Amino acid sequence: MIQISDTAQTHFRKLIEREGAPGMGVRLSAVDPGTPRADARLEFAEPSDLLGDEWAVDCDGFTLYVDAASVGWLDGAEIDIVAGTAGAQQLTIKAPRIKGEAPGDAASLVERVHWVVENEINPQLASHGGKVAVQEVSAEGVVLLRFGGGCQGCGMADVTLKQGIEKTLMGRVPGVTAVRDATDHDSGHAPYIPRGNAA
């Protein structure tokens, strides 16, 4: 079930009335669902824009159309208008399932490690233009990683590995015993902090 606040409904209704297009509604869809890049998209939709398989949610003065392929990812979503900075109003969409759910305890160690790397670690490394890929997870729980992007050749890669990645994986994934770096840092082309420049 998708919840759209009265404030958000009033906001959309006013915008639609201003457009004056008969039958115009709002379409909601999930973009890249089940990935760390997942996002929700809201757009105005005229009847000719609709595919016909959308789920329709009756609102006050318009219809919210939910893309059929996105329904499962958007279940439990909340659309609202909240007070932003300097008194401005801001549209918010909270979709707790859009990025997928962490694998359960029954999932393999490899699946759980991959999920934490893709959904928690890589989004943080992306702020520096970096990433990390899981090369191997041994039966003993040793995770072998390969850095890329701005992390490959970075003078702080060892710190990132020990204080960030290893700490996160060992704290979030029972069964991980150690994390090792398999990266050829000498071949890094654009490190975030060049080796030798790290404090």
UniProtKB/Swiss-Prot annotation:
Disulfide bonds: none annotated. Its cofactor is [4Fe-4S] cluster. The keyword 4Fe-4S applies. Belongs to the NfuA family. Homodimer. It comes from the Bacteria. It holds the Pfam family NifU. [4Fe-4S] cluster binds at residues 151, 154. Transmembrane segments: none annotated. Keywords: 4Fe-4S, Iron, Iron-sulfur, Metal-binding. The lineage of its organism: Bacteria, Pseudomonadati, Pseudomonadota, Gammaproteobacteria, Lysobacterales. The keyword Repeat does not apply. Involved in iron-sulfur cluster biogenesis. Binds a 4Fe-4S cluster, can transfer this cluster to apoproteins, and thereby intervenes in the maturation of Fe/S proteins. Could also act as a scaffold/chaperone for damaged Fe/S proteins. GO terms for molecular function: 4 iron, 4 sulfur cluster binding; iron ion binding. SUPFAM superfamilies: Fe-S cluster assembly (FSCA) domain-like, HesB-like domain. This is Fe/S biogenesis protein NfuA. GO terms for biological process: iron-sulfur cluster assembly; protein maturation. Binds 1 [4Fe-4S] cluster per subunit. The cluster is presumably bound at the interface of two monomers.
